[in-house]
Amino acid sequence: MPKTLKGTRHKEDSSTDLDYYDLPSNVNNKGFVYEEYIFELLKDQNLVPAGFVPAGADNSAPDCKFLWEGKPYNLEIKLDEKADYGQSGLKYNISSNKWFLDGKNTTQDKTMRENLKQLGVEGFVNSKDAWGGAGVPRLFERKSKNEKVTWGDKEYDYKNFPDKYIPINSNTLSSFYNSKKIYYIHIGGYGTYYMGKDPAGMTKFTDILKFNGTLKLRIRKKGSSSSPNYRFSTALLIDKKPSKSSFDITQSDSLDFLIANMS
């Protein structure tokens, strides 16, 4: 192959644009600290059910719980509007001709992949709007034969599997959380919302808004300009930011509403 291909710089390979495989195990530390802050804030006002502790890295459990009219409700917490809703590596199954989620084998990562599957992420990646009709990536074709990946393979895959953003409506996110009995979400700097349904009936007493943000699924490649190595990954991100909610459980006036309706 032409030597001019060696070391070709692609914008997808930027070291500042981190993908799933770049992320350290403590990437969510700021998010965990924020969850702990809200937990302590509510706990100080006796607004947390007895015995509950934050889930931390356990993606299968709610981030927090709060009391309303004597009943506990689950709460999802995001540090800010830039927080992702899940990331994963992507690989291709040569036998089934399907993309699938892949990554680390920690409990946190496995639960995250399961959540993304339930959200239909694998289906989105395999759709015609994504990479469903693009054929077999040479990266995985080579690996299935135990052959070395070449610069030419990289150029081929970078051309035939362009990075894409696929829009996902808010109902998909709401349905996913509702299936886990989570109907409320707090986003730092934006406020507190209900998703899909408002089982606590908080709209009767507060200015809480229905979450109206939309998501986008990013599918991408990333490699190095010094070697032909590269990989594929995906991330679920906020696309259209939600309208700011006047109800915010971190603010004193909203906390007063919770306290007044605690039991």
Language-model segments: which ranges?
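Charge-dense, extended regions
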Residues: 240-263
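Catalytic cores of nucleic-acid endonucleases
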Residues: 18-28, 36, 76-228, 237-238, ...
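Extended hydrophobic/Leu-rich segments
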Residues: 1, 5, 18-21, 47-48, ...
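Active-site beta-strand-loop-beta-strand hairpin of nuclease catalytic cores
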Residues: 56-58, 65-76, 82-84, 255
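A short, highly charged nucleic-acid-interacting micro-segment common to nuclease
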Residues: 3-37, 53-59
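Terminal low-complexity, poorly structured segments
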Residues: 1, 14, 19, 60, ...
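Short, intrinsically disordered low-complexity segments
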Residues: 2, 8, 217-219, 230
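A short acidic/basic microdomain associated with nuclease active sites
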Residues: 39-70
